[in-house]
C-alpha cells in the first residue's frame, strides 16, 4: 500500500484526493490549513463516502484515509507528497511538513513554477532527511470545485505531461513512479530549469491586466471586464513582447549552460496552442488563440464590487501569485543571464505598484520585497552555476 499525501484543498486538491483515493493500492491523506476546512471536508465525505470527481469520461468517488490539519499525522510514512497549492504557499507548507518527511520520499508540486526547487532546498537544508524533489510543468487537469469538501468537476485532461526532479539522476525512476498515479505518460525533463523557464501564466496574467488597465481612470466598471475576449491589438502586442523576452532568457540560459541540454523555450502562442488545441477556433496569431479559445470564454478579470460598479482586485492570484512567483522569477534569471527585458520591466514596475510592493528597484532585483518572492535572488543565487546545481 503506497501512502500519498495531498497538501491543499483547492480545485486541484479536491480532484487529486477523490481520484487517487479511488485507486486500489493507494492510501491517501489530505493536509489542510485549518480545522474549519477539515470539518467541511469530513462533512462532505461522510455524505457520500468520499470526494466525487466528475470527469469527461467517467465519475469516480474516492474516500481519503485521513483529512487533517496536523502535518505530522498527514506526512509520516508517506511515499509521495503532492503540493496542490498556489506558489506563494509552497515555502510555508514545505517548512511545516519537512520535519516529518522520510528520506527517499518524493516531494513535488503541481505545477512547480515559481522557484519551487529553491524553496524545497531551503526547507530541507541542514536536515538529515534527503527527499527527492520533483515538479510538474503543467497540471494534469483543468478542474473546478462544485461543492467544497464534496465534489469537483474535471473539464480538461492532458494526455501527456512533463516532470523534473532533483537530484537529476532520479528523474527517470521518479517519472515512472508518478505516472502510475495518473495513467498519463510522463516525460522526464533533464533539469528543473525546464519547468522554471516555461512560459505561461507568469506573463499571461500580468500582461493581460497591464494591457487592459494601464490607462484605466479608476472609475468603476459596470461589470467585471472580460479577461481574454476582445483583447486589443496593443494588449496582444504587449503579450507578444513579454513572450519574446521570456524566450530570450531561455535562449541565453541554453547558450551559457549547454550541459543542461535544455530544450528551446516555447512561445506563449505555442504553449497555448498546444495545451488547448481542440478549443481554439483560430490559431493563426496569439491574439486569435486567446480570443477564440472556448475554454476562456466568459472569464473575467478578478474584481471586487464597490459602490458604483466593479474594480479590479489587486490581491487576486493574477498579480499576487503570478508577479512575485512568476514574472519576478523570470526577471531574476534574466539579470543573472545578462538579458535586458524592457517590457518585463515595464509590466513589473506597474504590477508592483498595484500590489504595494517593490521587487525591481533601480533596474535590479534588489527591492525589499524580493525576499518574499520566488526570484533566485531571494535564495541568495547570483550566478548561472548556482542555478544549475541544487
Short names for language-model regions:
Residues 140-251, 373-389:
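Substrate/ligand-engaging "lid" and interaction regions
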Residues 8, 32, 85, 111, ...:
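Short beta-strand/turn micro-motifs composed of small residues
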Residues 87-150:
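Rossmann-like NAD(P)(H) cofactor-binding subdomain of soluble oxidoreductases
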Residues 289-390:
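Long, positively charged, glycine-interspersed low-complexity recognition regions
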Residues 185, 193-328, 337:
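C-terminal substrate-binding/catalytic lobe of Rossmann-fold NAD(P)-dependent dehydrogenases
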Residues 1-54:
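NAD(P)+-binding Rossmann beta1-loop-alpha1 motif at the extreme N-terminus of oxidoreductases
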Residues 58-104, 108:
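Rossmann-like NAD(P)-binding element
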Residues 7, 15, 115, 169, ...:
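Conserved active-site and cofactor/substrate-binding residues in soluble primary-metabolism enzymes
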Amino acid at each position: 500500500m503506497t501512502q500519498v499525501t495531498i497538501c491543499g484543498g483547492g480545485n486541484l486538491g479536491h480532484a487529486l484526493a477523490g481520484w487517487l483515493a479511488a485507486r486500489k493500492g493507494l492510501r491517501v491523506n489530505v493536509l489542510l490549513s485549518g480545522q474549519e476546512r477539515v470539518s467541511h471536508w469530513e462533512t462532505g465525505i461522510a455524505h457520500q463516502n468520499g470526494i466525487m470527481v466528475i470527469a469527461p469520461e467517467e465519475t469516480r468517488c474516492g474516500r481519503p484515509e485521513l483529512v487533517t490539519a496536523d502535518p505530522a499525522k498527514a506526512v509520516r510514512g508517506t511515499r509521495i507528497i503532492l503540493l496542490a497549492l498556489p506558489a506563494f504557499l509552497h515555502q510555508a507548507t514545505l517548512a511545516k511538513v519537512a520535519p516529518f518527511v522520510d528520506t527517499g520520499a518524493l516531494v513535488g508540486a503541481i505545477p512547480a513554477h515559481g522557484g519551487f526547487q529553491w524553496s524545497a532546498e531551503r526547507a530541507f537544508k541542514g536536515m538529515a532527511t534527503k527527499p527527492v524533489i520533483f515538479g510538474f510543468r503543467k497540471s494534469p487537469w483543468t478542474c473546478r470545485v462544485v461543492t467544497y469538501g464534496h465534489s469537483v468537476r474535471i473539464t480538461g485532461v492532458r494526455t501527456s505531461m512533463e516532470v523534473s526532479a532533483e537530484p537529476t539522476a532520479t528523474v527517470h525512476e521518479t517519472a515512472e513512479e508518478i505516472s502510475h498515479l495518473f495513467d498519463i505518460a510522463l516525460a522526464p525533463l533533464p533539469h528543473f530549469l525546464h519547468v522554471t523557464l516555461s512560459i505561461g501564466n507568469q506573463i499571461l496574467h500580468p500582461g493581460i491586466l497591464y494591457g487592459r488597465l494601464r490607462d484605466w481612470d479608476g472609475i468603476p466598471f459596470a461589470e467585471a471586464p472580460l479577461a481574454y475576449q476582445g483583447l486589443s491589438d496593443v494588449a496582444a502586442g504587449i503579450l507578444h513582447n513579454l513572450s519574446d523576452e521570456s524566450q530570450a532568457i531561455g535562449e541565453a540560459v541554453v547558450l551559457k549552460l549547454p550541459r543542461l541540454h535544455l530544450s528551446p523555450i516555447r512561445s506563449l502562442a505555442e504553449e497555448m496552442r498546444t495545451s488547448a488545441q481542440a478549443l481554439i477556433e483560430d490559431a493563426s496569431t496569439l491574439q486569435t488563440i486567446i480570443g477564440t479559445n472556448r475554454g476562456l470564454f466568459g472569464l473575467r478579470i478578478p474584481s471586487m464590487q464597490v459602490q458604483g460598479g466593479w474594480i479590479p482586485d489587486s490581491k487576486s492570484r493574477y498579480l499576487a501569485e503570478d508577479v512575485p512567483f512568476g514574472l519576478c522569477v523570470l526577471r531574476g534569471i534574466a539579470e543573472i543571464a545578462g538579458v535586458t527585458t524592457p517590457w518585463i520591466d515595464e509590466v513589473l514596475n506597474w504590477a508592483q505598484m498595484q500590489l504595494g510592493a517593490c521587487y525591481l528597484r533601480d533596474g535590479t532585483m534588489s527591492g525589499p520585497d524580493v525576499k518574499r518572492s520566488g526570484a533566485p535572488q531571494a535564495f541568495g543565487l547570483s550566478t548561472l552555476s548556482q542555478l544549475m546545481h541544487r
